[in-house]
A protein has these predicted regions:
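Glycine-rich phosphate-binding loops of nucleotide-dependent enzymes
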Residues: 1-211
Length: 211
């Protein structure tokens, strides 16, 4: 939705439906098809509360949308109340229920990352794309992120597409891994297959040296 592909097709298959082509769709239409994402660089509304950030994500699943929420007509009061309830529920799952009225800019770095994931989850996706979510995190924050992603996958039934350089995190979370080196796929397989792949070892660890 942000950068059009130079070639090929992007297809997404919502549960129980036929594949849909994403090429050429606007970002909001991509979201409506069940794909949500976070960015490598945090893109929160820093001067809005934690709750308001998540509510913005939820508005894509309403009939009134963002404009209706701003105008606050009588017809959408019930819908707005439902958005608040749904947003609280997401924050509870993510572990941020105690920060609903805090400004996003005041959250610790790891909590800001969680808030981005919460906002993406509020769109009710079946596929969640996480772009280097562990970037800039310390080991404790990375472990907490690992636990959160497992929870989202196993308890919420949301598929995760993870783009990440932290190989320990990738190996612990993934069922299937694609390895890209300078824009070209050099390997595909299970974590164990990738761990023992000569091309991956060469690209990421350097040439093997005899002891």
């Amino acid at each position: 939705g942000i950068y059009p592909p130079s070639e090929g097709k992007m297809l997404i298959r919502p549960p129980g439906q036929n594949p849909r082509k994403l090429n050429g769709l606007k970002p909001n239409h991509v979201t409506e098809n069940g794909l949500a994402r976070t960015f490598q660089n945090i893109r929160l509304f820093q001067n809005m509360t934690v709750l308001e950030n998540v509510m913005i994500g939820r508005h894509c699943r309403t009939s009134s949308g963002i404009i209706g929420a701003i105008l606050k007509g009588k017809s959408n009061k019930h819908e707005e109340a439902q958005i608040v309830e749904d947003s609280y529920e997401v924050l509870e799952k993510i572990g941020l229920a105690g920060f609903v009225n805090e400004f996003a800019k005041n959250l610790p770095y790891g909590a800001q990352r969680r808030l981005e994931i919460a906002r993406a989850m509020a769109t009710d996706p079946f596929l969640l794309l996480l772009d280097e979510p562990a970037a800039g995190m310390n080991p404790l924050e990375t472990k907490e992120l690992d636990d959160l992603i497992v929870k989202i996958r196993d308890q919420e039934g949301i598929s995760i597409l993870l783009i990440e350089h932290d190989m320990k995190l990738v190996m612990s979370l993934s069922d299937s891994i694609y390895v890209v080196d300078y824009g070209k796929k050099i390997a595909q397989g299970t974590p164990e297959e990738i761990r023992n792949n000569p091309a991956v070892i060469k690209a990421y660890l350097g040439e093997e040296v005899d002891a």
